[in-house]
Amino acid sequence: WQMIWQEKSPVVVMVTNVVELGKRKCHKYWPDESAQYGSIKVSQTHIEDLCDYTIRTFVIQQFDGYDVREVKQFHFTAWPDHGVPTRPTNILSFIRRVKSYETPGQGPTTV
């Protein structure tokens, strides 16, 4: 979250599931409600579960500051444990949705 804050990244993209075939593949780095990560407070304010992906909205702020930022996490949940998605339309729809939140002049998208 420190990197997200430092780089002013408004979009985070995740294309792996936390657990695949019963094995942990990725650390769940986001809170379900609110948590402190070093000097950054992260609060989840909204979650939208869709067929192939989830969009989570977070508000982040420095522990001692007044600057508040919104961060959207796009989590593609339909990637199979092995191989690639059977239909490219699923991932293409996901990419279009991610790009719809990107605007010129903002920080980078974090993957």
UniProtKB/Swiss-Prot annotation:
Its EC number is 3.1.3.48. Belongs to the protein-tyrosine phosphatase family. PROSITE patterns: TYR_PHOSPHATASE_PTP (PS50055). It comes from Styela plicata. This is Tyrosine-protein phosphatase 9. One of its GO terms (molecular function) is protein tyrosine phosphatase activity. InterPro entries: Prot-tyrosine_phosphatase-like, Protein-Tyr_Phosphatase, PTP_cat. Substrate binds at residue 81. Keywords: Hydrolase, Protein phosphatase. It catalyses: O-phospho-L-tyrosyl-[protein] + H2O = L-tyrosyl-[protein] + phosphate. Pfam families: Y_phosphatase. It comes from the Eukaryota. Coiled coil: none annotated.
